[in-house]
């Protein structure tokens, strides 16, 4: 699915690198509103195993701002129309 405006009542989630490979998608739309801490739970329900294999080492942005889902930003509300990105670590050589 190409990134685009989320339908009413949804937010967009973008997958990069290993997250895209694991899900088989570059993006999708999920129901909103939801607390940031529940995004990983939603993804684990859709893609069993993604938590340990991918999400445990990922950075997350909400509307281009980095958030810490496991800490102080866990209660941040993801609203309709927001954009969440799942960004695995990038290695260089």
From Swiss-Prot:
Annotated TM spans:
none
Q: From which domain of life does this come? A: Eukaryota
Q: Where is the protein localized?
A: Cytoplasm
An example of a Gene Ontology BP annotation on this entry? Mo-molybdopterin cofactor biosynthetic process
Q: Spell out which residues are annotated as carrying 1-thioglycine.
A: 93
Query: Which HAMAP family would you find in this protein's record?
Result: MOCS2A (MF_03051)
Subunit: Heterotetramer; composed of 2 small (MOCS2A) and 2 large (MOCS2B) subunits.
Name of the molecule in the record: Molybdopterin synthase sulfur carrier subunit
This protein's species is: Pyrenophora tritici-repentis (strain Pt-1C-BFP)
- Gene behind this chain? cnxG
